[in-house]
Swiss-Prot record:
GO biological process, one term: phylloquinone biosynthetic process
Cross-referenced SUPFAM superfamilies: Thioesterase/thiol ester dehydrase-isomerase (SSF54637)
rRNA-binding as UniProt keyword: no
Keyword vocabulary terms for this entry: Hydrolase
Protein family per UniProt: Belongs to the 4-hydroxybenzoyl-CoA thioesterase family. DHNA-CoA hydrolase subfamily.
Name of the molecule in the record: 1,4-dihydroxy-2-naphthoyl-CoA hydrolase
Pathway the protein takes part in: Cofactor biosynthesis; phylloquinone biosynthesis; Quinol/quinone metabolism; 1,4-dihydroxy-2-naphthoate biosynthesis; 1,4-dihydroxy-2-naphthoate from chorismate: step 7/7
CDD domains per the UniProt record, alphabetical: 4HBT
Entry EC no(s): 3.1.2.28
Function description: Catalyzes the hydrolysis of 1,4-dihydroxy-2-naphthoyl-CoA (DHNA-CoA) to 1,4-dihydroxy-2-naphthoate (DHNA), a reaction involved in phylloquinone (vitamin K1) biosynthesis.
Catalytic residues in the record: 12
Length: 137
């Protein structure tokens, strides 16, 4: 579980969390879970042989979130193919009685960064996916 305080920079002119900021916060939770599994994210994200770009992202807002809100993100992973996975996020506001305020899905594909061709997920990522695959089941 990842915890994050909504900052002013995360909000739009209406004072609520901007959709791209919410997706950024989801990516922070992704990075945090990789580190929690013992993956060195500096090495992981700068690997010259493997990249995992985002190919799809969506988010549904169920309730607004504002500057100062304490958010928790619970994630679960799903391997879709030998070269593709997605991460699903449930976002709750702690200061609002643990109310579910948003759900997001971010899908990644594994590629060779030189030729941009799909390739199988690295073993450490498959292990991470298996670890988190039952988190929200």
């Amino acid at each position: 579980m990842y915890t994050r305080t909504v900052r002013l920079q995360d909000t739009d002119a209406a004072g609520v969390v901007y959709f791209t900021s919410a997706l950024d916060i989801c990516h922070e939770a992704f990075e945090d879970s990789l580190m929690g599994a013992g993956i060195d994210i500096r090495t992981f994200f700068s690997n010259p042989d493997t990249a995992t770009p985002i190919i799809h992202a969506d988010i549904d807002f169920l309730k607004p979130s504002f500057c100062g809100d304490q958010l928790t993100l619970q994630l679960s992973t799903h391997q879709l193919a030998e070269d593709e996975f997605e991460v699903r996020y449930n976002i709750t506001a702690v200061n609002k009685g643990e109310r579910l305020i948003a759900k997001a899905t971010i899908r990644h594909v594994c590629i060779n960064p030189i030729n941009r061709q799909r390739q199988p997920l690295p073993k450490e990522l498959v292990t991470w996916i298996q670890r988190w695959s039952l988190a929200m089941s």
